């Protein structure tokens, strides 16, 4: 693939430890010192095998991977790191209601320095489209049907104060055409990021596309279990699919088109490739239109 197209890479968690946060391992009994030794080795291996700038050269267990890439006046990509600087997942991690810890200002996904860098970059970007290429879903998706609520504490809803801070910034600073990207959860999503997730009728201030895995997780499903209930609970979710595949985008000054390319199976050769869904975002309108 790299012989055919250029790569812009970033990591998530499995390069070093599932659901890691800062210097905290998910595994019980692993000290911060031991985890940082593992992280230093993982960073070195990552740097040696990925196309990265020299500025990303690791220094022991530290590696500066967040950066921006400019494609003229058309698009600016802000590649974030939401693992290395985050605080521990609140509420014991997992799918939980938002406990006070998840709502507190002390929790951070990006860390202060990266957050300020991002906000400065968005404020000064001359681009028509501003993309946030990062690790985990921003939309506050309720995974529990009915009156009870459950959100992923590993995703941005576990860091609700900073999540709201980000969306408020995009709205109040009138960031041009913000489009967020994520991965992590081996499934496809197309979301409208509304200003207030407590008011499901509030205005969308950005759009979000979550890309599936190429092969991890097996064959997957076109319609995940509980899809009808999930869409009813979360009307800002415009598409969800758990097949394997990739996301393809075509960007022009007038539109951003995203195609969800999937296959029905990966457990044997020969699966035909299809476009399962397509969405178009028009310049100046942060809503999703089915193509």
Please place each PLM-identified region on the residue numbering.
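Metal-dependent phosphoester/phosphodiester hydrolase catalytic core
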Residues: 1-291
């Amino acid at each position: 693939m790299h012989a055919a197209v250029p790569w812009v890479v970033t990591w998530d968690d499995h390069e070093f430890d599932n659901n890691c946060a800062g210097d905290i391992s998910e595994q019980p009994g692993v000290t911060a010192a031991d985890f940082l030794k593992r992280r230093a080795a993982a960073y070195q291996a990552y740097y040696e095998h990925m196309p990265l700038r020299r500025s990303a050269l690791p220094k022991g267990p530290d590696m500066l991977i967040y950066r921006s890439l400019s494609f003229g006046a058309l698009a600016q990509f802000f590649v974030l790191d939401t693992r290395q600087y985050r605080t521990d997942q609140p509420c014991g991690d997992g799918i939980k209601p938002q406990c006070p810890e998840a709502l507190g200002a002390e929790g951070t996904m990006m860390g202060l320095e990266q957050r300020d860098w991002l906000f400065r970059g968005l404020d000064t970007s001359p681009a028509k489209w501003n993309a946030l290429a990062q690790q985990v879903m921003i939309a506050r998706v309720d995974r529990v049907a009915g009156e009870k609520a459950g959100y992923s504490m590993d995703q941005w809803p576990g860091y609700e104060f900073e999540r709201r801070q980000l969306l408020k910034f995009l709205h109040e600073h009138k960031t041009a055409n913000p489009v967020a990207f994520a991965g992590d959860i081996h499934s496809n999503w197309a979301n409208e990021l509304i200003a207030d997730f407590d008011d499901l009728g509030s205005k969308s201030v950005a759009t979000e596309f979550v890309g599936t895995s190429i092969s991890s997780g097996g064959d997957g499903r076109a319609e995940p279990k509980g899809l009808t209930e999930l869409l009813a609970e979360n009307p800002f979710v415009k598409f969800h699919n758990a097949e394997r595949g990739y996301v393809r985008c075509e960007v022009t000054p007038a539109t951003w088109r995203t195609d969800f390319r999937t296959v029905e199976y990966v457990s044997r050769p020969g699966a035909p490739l299809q476009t399962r869904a397509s969405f178009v975002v028009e310049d100046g309108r942060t809503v999703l239109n089915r193509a």
